[in-house]
Structure formats: structure tokens, C-alpha cells
Amino acid sequence: MRHLIRSVAFLSIVTLASASVLAQNTGMKRWVQGKGWGWVWGPTDEVGSLNELTDASRLAALRLVTTGKVYDLGLPYDRNSFKWIGHSSGEIISFRSPAGERTMQDLPFTTPAGGNTGGTGWHSNVIFMSDNVATQIDGLAHISHGQDSHFYNGFLASEWGGDFGIRKADVTTIPPIVARGVMIDVAALKNVPALPTAYEITVSDLQAALKRQNVDVTPGTVVLVRTGTAQFWGVNGSDHAKLTMHDTAGIGISAAKWLVEQKGALAVGSDTSGLEYVPPSPADSKAVGGSFNPVHVYLLVEQGVHILEFHNLEGLAADRVYEFAYVATTNAIRGTVAGTALRPMALR
């Protein structure tokens, strides 16, 4: 028995030492190949894999910028834009306008009698919208799972879900992201404008596309997978028929695990509303205990890896730019669960 205990202890030490060496070799602090991340940052952590961002990693990403060209990865949003059925509609309402100010005359300083003889006015709007529309970054509180409705790091919706937003792992905990980015163009690999409805992007697809592009995913990389869907967004995302035809293509559990556990992807995204293919296969659903969004559960809840959605990758695809510095910041609105209507950038 003593011999067995000593053997187990020795193996544990070797495993931890190997993980430590691997982390040092990759520049990662907590990522372990074959495991990924998970709940490894302590019981109060709300940041997840983005804890890996450092001054050195940001500087390394910026060294990829050689031409100064900026690719705007954001999609324009308005009241008619496409929304997943599980998110609210939106409205943009004019609150003040030059014509209204002249008509109302409710503010003395806006009138000629009040000294405004030059006719100065202003526009001001009220925006009512979901925190999950257009180009977005899912926060770690976005998805819960299990009968206890836990989200990342074991936080419970019953304890941290407030009347005025979430109180743990909200969007303000997402740090500004400056990291190496890689775009994997699966649509180009398949030689189609956009992937077909409910197409599952496999590990083999990702590997073949990376080989074709002569680029690789290294630990700490932000990965963006192109399906071709975003080209149908149009001016404001109102071409819903075209969008919905292709929006259900995406990665499955095997591809998600390969990206995170084998390649060390820091964040994973695409040009669709949900990253993963839907509906999932029974096997993928059961992989997380039964779910209609198994990749979301795996990445956000189990791994603490943020999901990037509806990124406009058409410019990168047209120029065949596959490696770049990815830069994104979220709206600092407390209680929200996703950075929404964003304009991330790829710098080359």
C-alpha cells in the first residue's frame, strides 16, 4: 500500500511538473495541453482564459502589424437587424432633435429669447436593445447549465442573477483584448460562398484549412472561423432569409475541444450568431450532459473561454489575411452578459 501511495504521489508530482514546463514553454500560465483551462484561477475568478493576457503577449501580437491596415470586424446594427429568437427586439428612438427643440421650447437656453439666436441644436437618442445582437463577445455569465443553473466557476444564477443584470462575470470583467488572431476560412476550403445549413465544421476541416493557409493556432491565439454567413448581413442585417440559411453552420464539440485543449485557443469565434452548428447531434448534446448549445456550455461554462460572434471576416477573406493582431474592447455596462454591437479590429 505504501508503495502504491508513493507511486501515485510520484506520478502526481511528475504530472504537475510536466504541466508547469509545458505552460512555461507555451507562454501560458494555466493552460495544459489535453485539458485546456477550466476552473483553475481560484474560486472568485470571473475572467477565465483571458487571464493569460500579459504585456508581453500583447506586444508580441502587435509585432504582427507590418502594414498598418485595419480590418473592421464589426457589423452595423439597427432596429431591423437579425436577432436570435432567444433575444429581445430593439428600438432606436430620437429623444431630442433640432426640430423638436424649436417646437417644444421647453428649455429656455435653446430659444432666441434665451440667447440662442444662432439656432444651435442637437441630436440625442435612446437605445433599447439586447446585449446579444450584431458583433458580440459572450461573457462567462451568458450560459448556465445543470439543474442548479451554474455558470463559469460554479457561480449560481440563483445567487448572482439580479433584477438589473448579472452580478458575477458580467461584461465589465472582460479585459481589453489584444492578442494574436487567426482566421480559419472553412468556406474557402470547401470552395463555396457559404457553408450549408447545419454543417458541422470538423477537426479535419480546421486542420485542412490551416494547412491550406500555411498558418497554425498556437496557445494564446484568438481563433475566428469563417463560414461565409456574414456576407449576407447587408447594410444592417435585415436579409434574414439569407442569414438564417447559413447561420446554423459551425463547429461541434470535437472541433471546440481540439481548438482549446490541443491548440490553446484563447477565445473562439465566427461570423455567425452562435459559433456552433445547430441542431447538435445527440452525441454532441450528451457530451455535456444534454444541451441544445453544447459548444457554448463547453467553452463558456466548463473552460472559461469567451465566444466571439457575428464577426465580419469578409475583408480578411478577400485579402487572404489569416494572421493578424486582434483588438477588441467591450461596452462597460455593468450587469450585461455580452459586449454587443462592437467593432473589433484585425490589424495587419
Identify the meaning behind each predicted range.
Residues 1-9:
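Bacterial N-terminal signal peptides that target proteins for export
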Residues 24-348:
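Active-/binding-site microenvironments in catalytic and ligand-binding cores
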Residues 8-19:
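Bacterial N-terminal signal peptides
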